[in-house]
Amino acid sequence: MLQTQELQINIGPQHPSTHGVFRMIVTVDGETIVDLKPVFGYLHRNHEQLAEVSTYIQSMPYTDRLDYFNSMANNHALALAVEKLAGISVPQRAEYIRVLMVELTRILNHASAVGFLLNDMGAWQTPLMFGMREREKILDLFEMASGARMMCNYFRFGGVWRDLPPEFIPQLKELMQGLPSFFDEFERLLKENEILLSRTINVGVLPKEVAVSYSVTGPVLRASGIPYDVRRAEPYSVYDELDFDIPIGSVGDVYDRFLIRIEEMRQSYRILQQVIERLPDTTGGHINPAMANIGKQKALRPPPGDAYARIESPKGELGFYLVSDGSERPYRYKVRAPSFINLTPLGDMCRGHKVADVVVILGSIDIVMGEVDK
């Protein structure tokens, strides 16, 4: 009888397929994975402690550097938490601008994630460049509105930094003309490539019960068949006024996770159409006038208490928990990072698969190590 011996190998922390400084201790029997332990912390930057020694508004640019693909979404979550803590209202126009920016961010994120999946499976560069092409157009819009392409620091407590420039909406409409064909093109790349199908179908399956037990959220959870989306479960901003669907999968494998992301881009496109149509009729300005000078002439001092706010970021449920002692700095500042939580069931998803599948399964979770390690 053939006897085999288990072997422990390390993948990362310096590896081209780990999407950052991430280490996996993999126990293998031949090429088959027996166990996998994720090791975090190589990119820890003390984000929460920095926020606790900074004023509330000084923490806003730090959030850009959590998930640096989704700076607008990070800004939004912190803004909601502080507004809840301090009882700050947001003008209707600012709410619609916020939703517009976050949904553009969702398209940007998912386009990059699908491109990276194909890249990781050996479709070197070309499909990734399709996603990056659309991403660049969205970054141009962010630069037009905020002055920055990635670290936007655009949101403010009570609104946004400034109103949209006159040329923003015309350029956005021009971008949106090409998005439906881009979504179809990406879906065709997934559905009509036999090698890709064999590498993704029934690979990295995450059953819904396991997903819930790990508190997984976002596209990873919805791919497992659970229609949970914070925009519907606990509507914030103006999402309760907008019409969109929550796509779900049935198997919870790599294939489902990326089909979900493509369909979510289509739903973000629907939301953008509604926002553009309603934006001219919105009331109020880009920021609550009472908050216009916060950080310039005076500091924000919320009353003692605590608040938790969450949003549906492109990666999943992003939450900020704040405790105020009445000073200009938070007594406690805690981030619920979806990349970190979604990464915890990686061992369950990889067990029984081949070593070559680890890269594909990890890529399908869609993580950014800046958010994982904080």
Swiss-Prot record:
Which EC number(s) does UniProt give? 7.1.1.-
Q: Which InterPro entries match?
A: NADH_Q_OxRdtase_suD, NDH1_su_D/H, NiFe-Hase_large
- Which reaction is recorded as catalysed by this protein? a quinone + NADH + 5 H(+)(in) = a quinol + NAD(+) + 4 H(+)(out)
**According to its UniProt entry, what is the function of this protein?**
NDH-1 shuttles electrons from NADH, via FMN and iron-sulfur (Fe-S) centers, to quinones in the respiratory chain. The immediate electron acceptor for the enzyme in this species is believed to be ubiquinone. Couples the redox reaction to proton translocation (for every two electrons transferred, four hydrogen ions are translocated across the cytoplasmic membrane), and thus conserves the redox energy in a proton gradient.
Q: What keywords is this UniProt entry annotated with? A: Cell membrane, Membrane, NAD, Quinone, Translocase, Transport, Ubiquinone
Instruction: Tell me if Membrane is a UniProt keyword of this record.
Output: yes
Q: Which Pfam families match?
A: Complex1_49kDa
Where does the protein end up?
Cell membrane
Quaternary structure, from the entry: NDH-1 is composed of 14 different subunits. Subunits NuoB, C, D, E, F, and G constitute the peripheral sector of the complex.
Question: What name is this protein filed under?
Answer: NADH-quinone oxidoreductase subunit D 1
Topology relative to the membrane = Peripheral membrane protein
The yes or no answer to whether the keyword Transport is present is: yes
Gene3D superfamilies in alphabetical order: Cytochrome-c3 Hydrogenase, chain B (1.10.645.10)
Q: Which gene encodes it?
A: nuoD1
Report which superkingdom the organism of origin falls in: Bacteria
Identify its protein family: Belongs to the complex I 49 kDa subunit family.
Query: How is this protein annotated for GO cellular component?
Result: plasma membrane
List the Gene Ontology MF annotations in alphabetical order.
NAD binding; NADH:ubiquinone reductase (non-electrogenic) activity; quinone binding
Q: Which organism is it from?
A: Roseiflexus sp. (strain RS-1)
